[in-house]
Curated annotation (Swiss-Prot):
Signal peptide: none annotated. It holds the Pfam family Pribosyltran. One of its GO terms (molecular function) is magnesium ion binding. Belongs to the purine/pyrimidine phosphoribosyltransferase family. PyrE subfamily. This is Orotate phosphoribosyltransferase. Orotate binds at F34, F35, T128, R156. It comes from Marinomonas sp. (strain MWYL1). Catalyzes the transfer of a ribosyl phosphate group from 5-phosphoribose 1-diphosphate to orotate, leading to the formation of orotidine monophosphate (OMP).
Length: 215
């Protein structure tokens, strides 16, 4: 685990974005942890979050021409990533996002920002079922652009209905990489490093969950 990944986990815990306990997911599974990127909800938190996204993207070394933020959660994520790429890496990247409902007046259409062209890096928080990414792929194909990859905050490393995770299915179906700032393995490593009975208890619960549902 790299220092920025450890810093990100600490940051997510501080912001109450990453919590440990018992959480019932939409799938009905009872998870020992919960990750809610919507709680990165202040200027300072978003600025810091953008730096983590930008660092992950630069580390991955995947070529891209434009950032795409899927409505709604992906919009602030793509925006703060674009700002951080310029401020901290001197990379000036165009970005674009979609509206859920197309406008019929003014600038019109369902896309806002830079032209959706070339190699597109999709920015989102997590991939749970892959449904949102499939919708984005349709938008990219319609624009005759190419998917470069997906950048997310957390890879849960968890099976879907079959043997693969939603991320593995996206990589298989669309032939593009999914980059994550951290994975569940990184969270487990972080918990193991802490000298705390409480964190040790959480680690045991996460290990058991990973054995049952992990890939």
């Amino acid at each position: 685990m790299k220092p920025y990944q450890r810093d990100f986990i600490e940051f997510a815990i501080e912001q109450n974005v990453l919590r440990f306990g018992e959480f019932t997911l939409k799938s009905g599974r009872v998870s020992p942890y919960f990750f809610n990127a919507g709680l990165f909800s202040s200027g300072q938190a978003l600025a810091k979050l953008g730096r983590f996204y930008a660092t992950s993207l630069m580390e991955a070394n995947v070529p891209f021409d434009v950032l795409f933020g899927p409505a709604y959660k992906g919009i602030p994520l793509a925006t703060t990533t674009a700002v951080a790429l310029y401020d901290h890496h001197n990379v000036d990247t165009p970005y674009v996002f979609n509206r859920k409902e197309a406008k019929t007046h003014g600038e019109g259409g369902s896309l806002v920002g830079a032209p959706l062209a070339g190699n597109v890096m999709i920015i989102d928080d997590v991939i749970t079922a892959g449904t949102a990414i499939r919708e984005v792929m349709a938008i990219i194909q319609q624009a005759n652009a190419l998917p470069a990859g997906v950048l997310i905050a957390l890879d849960r490393q968890e099976r879907g209905q079959g043997e693969l995770s939603a991320i593995q299915e996206v990589e298989r179906d669309f032939g593009m990489p999914v980059i994550s700032i951290v994975s569940l393995n990184d969270i487990m490593t972080y918990l193991a490093e802490q000298d705390s009975p409480e964190f040790a208890k959480h680690l045991d619960a996460v290990k058991a969950y990973r054995l049952q549902y992990g890939i």
